[in-house]
């Protein structure tokens, strides 16, 4: 599995050119993309500026000597490469297994070319087997949890060392065990309108390419009408 993730990450790095502003994703597959960018910066003199999606990726990029800018300092990002937890046949996805969904979506939004790197196990017919992360403000989180429970969404707070996990932005995550999401756009719209929800892990209609590593090698899938 690690070898597949590395293949996908290294393949994605080939899309990075001199002078680009590059969004650096978070997670076990995006990690290899960031490592390869670091190698190219140091060994090939690649000239890029990175914008990170989590404190973990910031530390990784700094350790590799990749020049960084804050997202507030830029208007557009040329290319962002990130992982995904599930991708359906319509190129909608669930992200946020690494608890960085809010920053990931903020970086993805001004990106001209958005690429996901995954291993083939992440490609699914329908989203929902992977729990959907919902980032919520701490105030009123228990009430919101009960709302999700009554709706039958099987919520659970994301935990870390027996405490509720706190994201880089200071929020909680409620994971929804939905099994299947029949209408991802409608479900996203409902969450967007829910007071107390900061962001959710449905990334619908956002990605341009999905790089999939499998036993037969690497495939680059182009999203329709992108």
Curated annotation (Swiss-Prot):
The UniProt annotation places substrate binding at 26-29, 82-85, 95-98, 122
The organism's taxonomic lineage, starting at the top = Bacteria, Bacillati, Bacillota, Bacilli, Lactobacillales
EC code(s) of this entry: 5.3.1.6
CDD domains from the UniProt entry:
RPI_A
What the protein does comes down to: Catalyzes the reversible conversion of ribose-5-phosphate to ribulose 5-phosphate.
Q: Name one GO molecular function term.
A: ribose-5-phosphate isomerase activity
Task: State the family named in the UniProt similarity comment for this chain.
Answer: Belongs to the ribose 5-phosphate isomerase family.
| Protein name per Swiss-Prot or TrEMBL | Ribose-5-phosphate isomerase A
Instruction: Please give the organism.
Output: Streptococcus uberis (strain ATCC BAA-854 / 0140J)
């Amino acid at each position: 599995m690690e070898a597949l993730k590395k293949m996908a990450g290294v393949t994605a790095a080939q899309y990075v050119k001199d002078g680009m502003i590059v969004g650096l994703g978070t997670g076990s597959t995006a990690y290899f993309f960031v490592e390869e960018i670091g190698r190219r910066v140091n060994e090939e003199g690649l000239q890029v500026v990175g914008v990170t999606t989590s404190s973990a990726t910031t530390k990784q990029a700094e350790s590799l000597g990749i020049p960084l800018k804050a997202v507030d300092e830029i208007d557009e990002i040329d290319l962002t490469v990130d992982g995904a937890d599930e991708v359906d046949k319509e190129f909608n996805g669930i992200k946020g297994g690494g608890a960085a969904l809010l920053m990931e979506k903020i970086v993805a939004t001004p990106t001209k070319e958005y690429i996901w790197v995954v291993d083939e196990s992440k490609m699914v017919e329908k989203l929902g087997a992977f729990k959907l992360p919902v980032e919520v403000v701490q105030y009123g989180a228990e009430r919101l949890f009960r709302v999700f429970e009554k709706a039958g969404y099987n919520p659970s707070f994301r935990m870390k060392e027996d405490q509720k996990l706190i994201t880089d932005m200071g929020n909680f995550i409620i994971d929804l065990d939905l099994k299947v999401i029949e209408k991802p756009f409608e479900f996203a719209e409902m969450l967007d309108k829910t007071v107390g929800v900061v962001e959710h892990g449905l990334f619908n209609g956002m990605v341009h390419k999905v790089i999939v590593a499998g036993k037969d090698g690497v495939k680059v899938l182009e999203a329709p009408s992108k």
